[in-house]
Curated annotation (Swiss-Prot):
Pfam families: Abhydrolase_3. One of its GO terms (molecular function) is carboxylic ester hydrolase activity. The keyword Cytoplasm applies. InterPro entries: AB_hydrolase_3, AB_hydrolase_fold, Acetyl_esterase, GDXG_lipolytic_enzyme, Lipase_GDXG_put_SER_AS. Its main location: cytoplasm. This is Acetyl esterase. It comes from the Bacteria. It comes from Salmonella paratyphi B (strain ATCC BAA-1250 / SPB7). The gene is aes. One of its GO terms (cellular component) is cytoplasm. Its EC number is 3.1.1.-.
């Protein structure tokens, strides 16, 4: 599709989103578009420091977990001494960027709003680690904490998964992996999904949206996919193209959030409509005037904080509902 035919989303954003797009951090260099991936990772970490500031204070603990691929670092956020459930968080970043620090504020706010222990998983990034390593590392982390719950004062009878963007795919894929492989790490009471991609190769929204402002052009999306997958056959795997999995049964309750001008919004719409058609518990909410990744910007956007609180409320409601 010719770029000129795309919707001019920058003229349609909310005032809050526009303020974020126009915000310039003092002393921050331009994005290293032609830099190597490690340079881009360091830039992303530097750029996110401002957005992670002024986060709620709470007890945190770092735990290095052994997995079949080697050690994986996790961070436990405990807003109170005891917790009614444990929520595992998978960060976004196109499978190639991000870590526990780039999403620290998001996890702290989720812990505060749910009152539960949130465990961030610093899964191995692509292209150094290819599908399905991040999923298998996540499952190994869940298994570890289910076996060491007392040591960390965790309640693992009720667990959940959460993630944004690529992390949302990993969150849902990990829950389906547990179901499909008959691995028990606790009762998965909910999955919180913010603007994820779930396997579509093309869609109306991917044609109409996406540009330099969000790093989600068609070329960008192809690059992320090629970095993550081992080969083209993986595109059809039921834990990458989640629409090739069985979504008609035993899918944990899903909170599905999308951004209005996100090229990935059709993934969320299709996921919601599929689950709804098969009577799988789910809730869908679109946040008007927003771009992909808006969850990061709660320091300037009340709607980002609203989206986190909406997910937290969904999770807390499922804590009280027997499954």
């Amino acid at each position: 599709m010719k770029p000129e035919n795309k919707i001019p989303v920058l003229t349609r954003l909310s005032d809050e989103m526009t303020a974020v797009v126009n915000f310039q951090q003092p002393g921050l260099p331009p994005w290293p578009a032609d830099g190597d991936i490690e340079t881009q990772r360091q830039y992303y970490l530097l750029e996110r420091r401002f957005w992670n500031a002024d986060a709620p204070s709470m007890t945190t603990r770092t735990c290095v977990v052994p997995t079949p691929y080697g050690d994986v670092t996790t961070r436990l956020y405990s807003p109170q001494p005891t917790s009614q459930a444990t929520l595992y968080y998978l960060h976004g970043g196109g499978f190639i960027l991000g870590n526990l620090d780039t999403h620290d504020r998001i996890m702290r706010l989720l812990a505060r709003y749910t009152g539960c222990t949130v465990i961030g998983i610093d899964y191995s990034l692509s292209p150094q680690a290819r599908y399905p390593q991040a999923i298998e590392e996540t499952v190994a982390v869940c298994s570890y904490f289910s076996q060491h719950a007392d040591e960390y004062s965790l309640n693992v009878e009720k667990i959940g998964f959460a993630g944004d963007s690529a992390g949302a795919m990993l969150a849902l894929a990990s829950a389906l992996w547990l179901r499909d492989k008959h691995i028990r790490c606790g009762n998965v009471i909910a999955i919180l999904l913010w603007y994820g991609l779930y396997g579509l190769q093309d869609s109306v929204s991917r044609r109409l949206f996406g540009g330099a402002w969000d790093g989600l052009t068609r070329e960008d999306l192809d690059m992320y996919e090629k970095a993550y997958l081992r080969n083209e056959d993986d595109r059809e795997s039921p834990w990458y193209c989640l629409f090739n999995n069985d979504l008609t049964r035993d899918v944990p309750p899903c909170f599905i959030a999308s951004a209005e001008f996100d090229p990935l919004i059709d993934d969320s719409r299709l996921l919601h409509q599929t689950l709804q058609a098969h009577q799988q518990p789910c809730e869908y909410k679109m946040y008007p005037g927003t771009l992909h990744a808006f969850l990061h910007y709660s320091r300037m956007m009340t709607i980002a904080d609203d989206a986190l609180q909406d997910g937290a409320r969904f999770f807390m409601a499922r804590m009280k509902t027997p499954r």
